[in-house]
């Protein structure tokens, strides 16, 4: 029972409700199987890597076809295939840990993907070629961008990326300033004039980007579109949903979403104890990110604890009431978590840094890729050296209106040895050092059993009560 509070079991995976509002979960016909799942491309990938064991990672909505695909690949390559269903975290991430359990040589990821860089196994992505009505898509673009000189970047959900080539043929001749994004692959280096975000790359006119650009997005509502809008809130967005065949102007809720993120930053500024949530084990540099966050929190004079609990839900995190704010280290697709259902706020590493690092300021947009915050990243900001005279200062909380104290760690105190690792207390148990954990313990109505050493007489063990709770032997039953 206790283990279920911290990790997901098999019954939960089987009984999980899938959002099928815009998902076609019917099994694909045999004649379309090879095209939809790109069987020939996958066979070439397996043979090129001389793989004997192949892990096939399917999301829930594509599991119906998993056995058919596995059989076709085994017949064509002779390799042994292993189907990976329920993932440890988000289905958009490559589950390298599960692939290593079966000692796979390569991994094939099916369905939507966050395209986060991986470092352990060769990975091939098969997004699934979802159908797009190109007539309606082109019509939506032409009706919205009537000025042929408009500067537009065309982005898409990965499952519709195959349709961008056809869209380019229809509109590029009339719109010279339209740019079509391309998906990136591991190992590619970006040129100085390129923008690389969320596994997509494009080269806008940097003198006009982003204020003078519009973004035409092919895909439905979801985390991908939300991330794009919160990353570039100064761009005007227009989306075409292939599932409904309709286009619409986006952006009415962006300002509200940014206000919510700013509120979470203020909650993080008020926090004394942070919980670092491990939301991925496959994205490259996640260990460096965990170490970086722990260091930033320590330099800010606050406490941190690390948790790895698999898929997140309110019940799991409610087991840690001592935590003021949780920091989620995950892929960009899963970083912006709606924490309204959780008892404590869940923020991104960028929001945590804004709250703890005096040198980092709120920039008006979201950074969901934690790799950009690491040393050498495009958004890295070094924690400033703290002068001992400025180590303690106060400001006013915008949420509670109360004064809050900051206790920045002076650089010299980071060097600790065995002689200074303990603090000797006096007989009066006077407070020797401020501790957020101790202050939380003092505020609790029940602080645990008091041993009261030396205050109670020592007695021999006596025979206790017998029976069950409903009726002990010494109780009179009616």
Curated annotation (Swiss-Prot):
Database matches in InterPro entries: DHP2, DPH1/DPH2, DPH1/DPH2_1, DPH1/DPH2_3
Coiled coil: none
An annotated GO BP: protein histidyl modification to diphthamide
Keywords per UniProt: Iron, Iron-sulfur, Metal-binding
Recorded GO MF terms: 2-(3-amino-3-carboxypropyl)histidine synthase activity; 4 iron, 4 sulfur cluster binding; metal ion binding
Chain positions recorded as [4Fe-4S] cluster binding sites: 93, 114, 331
Cofactor notes: Binds 1 [4Fe-4S] cluster per subunit. The cluster facilitates the reduction of the catalytic iron-sulfur cluster in the dph1 subunit.
Any one Gene Ontology cellular component term annotated for this protein: 2-(3-amino-3-carboxypropyl)histidine synthase complex
Pathway(s) where this gene product acts: Protein modification; peptidyl-diphthamide biosynthesis
Gene3D superfamilies attached to this UniProt entry: Diphthamide synthesis DPH1/DPH2 domain 1, Diphthamide synthesis DPH1/DPH2 domain 3
Highest taxon, organism lineage: Eukaryota
Cofactor(s) for this UniProt protein: [4Fe-4S] cluster
Family classification: Belongs to the DPH1/DPH2 family. DPH2 subfamily.
Role played: Required for the first step of diphthamide biosynthesis, a post-translational modification of histidine which occurs in elongation factor 2. Dph1 and dph2 transfer a 3-amino-3-carboxypropyl (ACP) group from S-adenosyl-L-methionine (SAM) to a histidine residue, the reaction is assisted by a reduction system comprising dph3 and a NADH-dependent reductase. Facilitates the reduction of the catalytic iron-sulfur cluster found in the dph1 subunit.
Subunit structure: Component of the 2-(3-amino-3-carboxypropyl)histidine synthase complex composed of dph1, dph2, dph3 and a NADH-dependent reductase.
Protein name: 2-(3-amino-3-carboxypropyl)histidine synthase subunit 2
Organism: Xenopus laevis (African clawed frog)
């Amino acid at each position: 029972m206790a283990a279920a509070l911290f990790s997901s079991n098999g019954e939960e995976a089987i009984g999980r409700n899938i959002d099928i509002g815009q998902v076609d979960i019917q099994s694909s016909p045999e004649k379309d199987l090879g095209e939809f799942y790109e069987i020939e491309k996958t066979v070439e990938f397996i043979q090129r890597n001389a793989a004997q064991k192949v892990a096939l990672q399917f999301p829930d909505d594509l599991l119906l076809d998993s056995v058919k695909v596995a059989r076709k690949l085994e017949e064509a390559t002779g390799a042994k295939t292993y189907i990976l269903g329920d993932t440890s975290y988000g289905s958009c991430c490559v589950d390298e840990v599960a692939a290593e359990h079966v000692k796979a040589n390569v991994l094939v990821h099916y369905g939507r993907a966050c395209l986060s860089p991986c470092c352990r196994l060769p990975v091939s992505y098969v997004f699934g070629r979802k159908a797009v009505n190109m007539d309606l898509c082109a019509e939506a673009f032409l009706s919205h961008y009537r000025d042929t000189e408009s500067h537009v970047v065309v982005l898409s959900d990965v499952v519709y990326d195959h349709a961008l080539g056809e869209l380019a043929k229809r509109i590029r001749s009339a719109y010279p300033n339209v740019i079509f994004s391309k998906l990136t692959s591991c190992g590619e280096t970006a040129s100085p004039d390129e923008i690389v975000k969320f596994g997509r790359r494009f080269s806008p006119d940097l003198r006009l980007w982003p204020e003078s650009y519009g973004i035409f997005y092919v895909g439905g509502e979801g985390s991908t579109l939300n991330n794009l809008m919160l990353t570039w809130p100064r761009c005007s967005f227009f989306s075409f949903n292939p599932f409904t065949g309709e286009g619409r102007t986006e952006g009415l809720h962006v300002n509200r979403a940014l206000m919510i993120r700013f509120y979470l930053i203020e909650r993080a500024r008020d926090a004394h104890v942070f919980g670092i949530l491990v939301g991925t084990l496959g994205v490259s540099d996640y260990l460096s990110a965990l170490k970086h966050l722990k260091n930033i929190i320590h330099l800010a004079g606050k406490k941190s604890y690390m948790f790895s609990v698999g898929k997140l839900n309110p019940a799991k995190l409610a087991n840690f009431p001592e935590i003021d704010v949780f920091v989620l280290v995950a892929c960009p697709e899963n970083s912006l978590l709606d924490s309204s259902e959780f008892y404590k706020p869940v923020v991104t590493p960028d929001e945590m840094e804004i709250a703890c690092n005096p040198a980092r300021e709120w920039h008006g947009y979201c950074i969901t890729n934690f790799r950009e915050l690491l040393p050498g990243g495009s958004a890295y900001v070094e924690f400033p050296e703290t002068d001992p005279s400025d180590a303690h200062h106060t400001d006013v909380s915008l949420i509670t209106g109360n004064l809050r104290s900051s206790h920045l760690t002076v650089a010299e105190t980071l060097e600790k040895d065995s002689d200074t690792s303990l603090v000797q207390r006096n007989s009066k148990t006077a407070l020797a050092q401020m501790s957020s954990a101790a202050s939380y313990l003092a505020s609790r109505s029940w602080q645990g059993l008091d041993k009261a050493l030396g205050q109670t007489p020592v007695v021999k063990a006596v025979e206790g009560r017998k029976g069950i709770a409903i009726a002990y032997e010494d109780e009179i039953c009616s």
